[in-house]
From Swiss-Prot:
GO cellular component term, pick one: cytosol
Organism expressing this protein natively: Escherichia coli (strain SE11)
GO biological process, one term: proteolysis
Role of this protein: Involved in the modulation of the activity of the glucose-phosphotransferase system (glucose-PTS). Interacts with the transcriptional repressor Mlc, preventing its interaction with DNA and leading to the modulation of expression of genes regulated by Mlc, including ptsG, which encodes the PTS system glucose-specific EIICB component. Shows zinc-dependent metallopeptidase activity.
Keyword annotations: Aminopeptidase, Cytoplasm, Hydrolase, Metal-binding, Metalloprotease, Protease, Zinc
Protein name: Mlc titration factor A
Cofactor note: Binds 1 zinc ion per subunit.
Coiled coil regions, renumbered to chain: none
Annotated Zn(2+) binding sites: 111, 148, 152, 211
Record note on quaternary structure: Interacts with Mlc.
InterPro entries in alphabetical order: MetalloPept_cat_dom_sf, MtfA_enterob, MtfA_fam, MtfA_N
One GO MF term attached to the UniProt entry: metallopeptidase activity
Known EC number: 3.4.11.-
Amino acid sequence: MIKWPWKVQESAHQTALPWQEALSIPLLTCLTEQEQSKLVTLAERFLQQKRLVPLQGFELDSLRSCRIALLFCLPVLELGLEWLDGFHEVLIYPAPFVVDDEWEDDIGLVHNQRIVQSGQSWQQGPIVLNWLDIQDSFDASGFNLIIHEVAHKLDTRNGDRASGVPFIPLREVAGWEHDLHAAMNNIQEEIELVGENAASIDAYAASDPAECFAVLSEYFFSAPELFAPRFPSLWQRFCQFYQQDPLQRLHRTNDTDSFSATNVH
């Protein structure tokens, strides 16, 4: 059982929060005890600073709140919670939701249509999610709705539109853009060869640089074994930006599991 270092100082309300149960999802089991402790500390602050708003009858209990907060804080585990300063509310639907979408075509005509969305991240507003897809984000499959939307927030942290280039030193931007576009082209080539459904990386990553950064951020944390060997140069840039190495965590966990298995009699 993990001994949490903050328990001496936490309030009665915080003590009641089911952090250990919340940490039991597959995505977070690769973290060391020290990393889990740090993540929970950030998640506690997240719940103090942000407002989780359930919509359309969705029931938000303490376990769900904790797991949502943990997933929000995983990408900023080493960056710091201030990287999530760009919003104050998280709106949560029970399932994918319908929105009115307005877009302009190449000749300037404005079109309106109703579309189904899994999530949204407004540059100067809230993050919008749905619980069905949040639940599907608990495993290590390459899909993670919360990390996807957080990546968009990190992308626009410098105040500009999402470009696929997060807030990094100016000298690194050209290299980042080169590697990101190379990854997009590679993903598009696979799509043309085998089709969207059979592609090993979500085809949405090939749609534009901002979505490529968000989708690959999902794979960075939840399927590093697919990301790292395929795009090694971009992988290193992601490791440097997020200041984390999920592939190393995965290898460490696998080594521990193998060692435990060889010692079972």
